[in-house]
């Protein structure tokens, strides 16, 4: 056992003495030691109950002959951090979480690991940390939130609440209606109910084989979720000493491909591109952002979930057959994109796991023949505005897929929010938000507030938004993020001026600004990047080490 280094032999008497102080007995030193990486935090709706779930998990681990040791990671709620300086810390928190797991697991030589994330950057951060440790690992999240309803019975969620702000500003809804949405959009604990970043990543954990079936769709705070946690506790004890289930043996190149295939089929959050690039690098997989379009071109988009389809939520996907039904349906298009032979933590191959699964509601999960689109729900655009690529969630486009318009430039998200609210942006404009990339922000803020204001003001089909920052999974519209190179590193987005004509064509994967070579060279010679005053020491450290979005915004070693 890996843990023998802290518990076997006479030289480890001091170590055992310390472990006895935690309650261990003689018989425990012959058992596998299991790390339980929890992310309990009271301010996050998807996490405030994870302390109770961890107790259920640890109890099951003890019953099955192993010794659990719970530790905690930090967490940031992107929704609460949205639209102010707190969002600067969201993406950097991913690295702290990864470092935390690497530190605790390796410092104490634990044999196996169960990760209990749920929201936003916590899932990818834990995956990255687990890959560094490389022991048998199971992911079991806290589960998605129920959707909310208005008094009239209309389904709503967090995206509704953000867009309601713009509607209130334009007097489309009253203060009373805004309050009704506020009080009903998030009716229970869990990860926000749409196909936002948290639920996107939790479903991809199923596709990668590192979580048990149902991880992405079984609702939080239900008996079914508690049983899933018990199953994870039993299973980790079965595989704790089996090298076949080291996470790098499960999350390999084929698993990365499977995750991206499922992501395209479901129109996941654009953040998944950033996180899968980072995860692939930790897994030793050479994934390039340019490869994603080939996957998208071969995968039908068969499930639309809020915000792309506001009435459909994760509980509906679960009711319609869950991820197994989605994966089974994708596999019917026999084009070699899915690797059904890949092993999962349950001991089954992915193909065996989905088995005889079938769609129970074709209005929620479509057949391939009746797909929303013959191509996937995400795309990577290239051009003189994004030589290293940028990302758009095509599943969320509400207007035309081809757009040309005049640039309206802002050097921060705060400037953009003020400009949109004051009416500076009109039909036919391309909103440019720059100096919000991984290094320029720093921290690559999510632009849900600006995009929600655009939608709420009725401009969703008539305005495009481009940024070197990123978007919440709740964003919809012609919103293009992750532009690389970013403004802070001299990218073309930093050279744009108000009135420049920008051409976007999603179907040809292109994004360009109409500038002559002479004008471009002139602007480059005159370019001086905006320098922001940073008060946080961690943000200054992060800014020095972070790479751009085309590399997953990972830190340089």
Swiss-Prot record:
GO molecular function: 2 iron, 2 sulfur cluster binding; dihydroxy-acid dehydratase activity; magnesium ion binding
Co-factor(s): [2Fe-2S] cluster; Mg(2+)
Protein residues bound to [2Fe-2S] cluster: 119, 192
Annotated signal sequence range: none
Alphabetic keyword roster: 2Fe-2S, Amino-acid biosynthesis, Branched-chain amino acid biosynthesis, Iron, Iron-sulfur, Lyase, Magnesium, Metal-binding
Enzyme class: lyase
Reaction(s) the record says it catalyses: (2R)-2,3-dihydroxy-3-methylbutanoate = 3-methyl-2-oxobutanoate + H2O; (2R,3R)-2,3-dihydroxy-3-methylpentanoate = (S)-3-methyl-2-oxopentanoate + H2O
Pathway given in the UniProt record: Amino-acid biosynthesis; L-isoleucine biosynthesis; L-isoleucine from 2-oxobutanoate: step 3/4; Amino-acid biosynthesis; L-valine biosynthesis; L-valine from pyruvate: step 3/4
One Gene Ontology term, aspect cellular component: cytosol
GO BP terms in the entry: isoleucine biosynthetic process; L-valine biosynthetic process
Enzyme Commission number, as recorded: 4.2.1.9
Active site positions, chain numbering: 472
Cofactor binding note from Swiss-Prot or TrEMBL: Binds 1 [2Fe-2S] cluster per subunit. This cluster acts as a Lewis acid cofactor.
Residue(s) carrying N6-carboxylysine: 121
Residues involved in Mg(2+) binding: 78, 120-121, 446
Entry's family note: Belongs to the IlvD/Edd family.
Subunit structure: Homodimer.
Free-text function comment from the UniProt entry: Functions in the biosynthesis of branched-chain amino acids. Catalyzes the dehydration of (2R,3R)-2,3-dihydroxy-3-methylpentanoate (2,3-dihydroxy-3-methylvalerate) into 2-oxo-3-methylpentanoate (2-oxo-3-methylvalerate) and of (2R)-2,3-dihydroxy-3-methylbutanoate (2,3-dihydroxyisovalerate) into 2-oxo-3-methylbutanoate (2-oxoisovalerate), the penultimate precursor to L-isoleucine and L-valine, respectively.
Name of protein: Dihydroxy-acid dehydratase
Originating species: Campylobacter curvus (strain 525.92)
Gene this chain is encoded by: ilvD
